[in-house]
Amino acid sequence: MSSTAIVSGDESLEPTLQNLLDQKTLRWVFVGGKGGVGKTTTSCSLAIQLAKVRKSVLLISTDPAHNLSDAFGQKFGKEARLIDGFDNLSAMEIDPNGSIQDLLAAGGDQADDPMGGLGLGGMMQDLAFSIPGVDEAMSFAEVLKQVKSLSYEVIIFDTAPTGHTLRFLQFPTVLEKALGKLSQLSSQFGPMLNSVLGARGGLPGGQNLDEILSKMESLRETIGEVNAQFKDADLTTFVCVCIAEFLSLYETERMIQELTSYQIDTHCIVVNQLLFPGKDSSCEQCKARRKMQKKYLNEIEELYEDFNVVRMPMLVEEVRGKEKLEKFSNMLINPYIPPQE
């Protein structure tokens, strides 16, 4: 699905991500792909380029591996923090597997065990966790709420490897189910639960069930609002990262089909780790691999003729640290010119 905001007429699409820099309305950029294809390097590099043309940029990793800290050589956590050497580019790392316990704890001192000592705490947690993905949904909703209040001009998500990448799209439904179950519990047992909780010191932060339900409702509204923005091609796009191999191409196609079904714009693909052995190269393995890569590159070009396809070379060293990331990021904008084959 290509964005009408980007593509017009019969223009051939540039093999760069320059269009993302030119799209001034863009607010949310998701970078996703199979593990090990250079997704984090690509998202960091894109963030560096966007920081050149935007007032404030936030890079968020939702990958539990937390590779942003490794990429920049700087520790990040769940609070947004400026990246060394930049005055308008910040980063944060959150764990989308964070627990619903944080919501129940309301940030109190007992966050590690908000239900400690409460006989029916386990029952509430069992109820909440019986809904698949509810803990991730709550955690992600809290992050989106925080991000909304931070008012960054553009936000880039370095997502978890494919499979988990698109789970955020199901969150509004998951939250509605959770809300429905808890509302049902509250209407049936609310007075009794509140009196028992009151006798035992209540929930952490002095909350009762109604307050928890109200908090969940406000989170559901926030995530519903953001979800509507995700479906607006002027505000949101998804950059697919892959390598020229069968499994990676298969995952990319599956992801693009899913994004299309969710009405989320995607019109850029970054193909990493391409080999370009010279004519006189004596490396037979390199030539064989290049032959295989060319086959899948041709398939990518046929399948995604209405996409900006960026070809990135295999590098001899890891892309870590500000200088190497900046160098890599330049190739996302100025196409790499390989030696003659």
Swiss-Prot record:
The entry's Zn(2+)-binding residues are: 283, 286
Which SUPFAM superfamilies would you find in this protein's record? P-loop containing nucleoside triphosphate hydrolases
Q: Does the keyword Transmembrane helix apply?
A: no
The entry's cellular-component GO terms read: GET complex
- Keyword Translocase (UniProt): no
Q: Its biological function?
A: ATPase required for the post-translational delivery of tail-anchored (TA) proteins to the endoplasmic reticulum. Recognizes and selectively binds the transmembrane domain of TA proteins in the cytosol. This complex then targets to the endoplasmic reticulum by membrane-bound receptors, where the tail-anchored protein is released for insertion. This process is regulated by ATP binding and hydrolysis. ATP binding drives the homodimer towards the closed dimer state, facilitating recognition of newly synthesized TA membrane proteins. ATP hydrolysis is required for insertion.
Similarity field: Belongs to the arsA ATPase family.
Q: What is this protein called?
A: ATPase GET3
In its UniProt entry, the species of origin is given as Ajellomyces dermatitidis (strain ER-3 / ATCC MYA-2586)
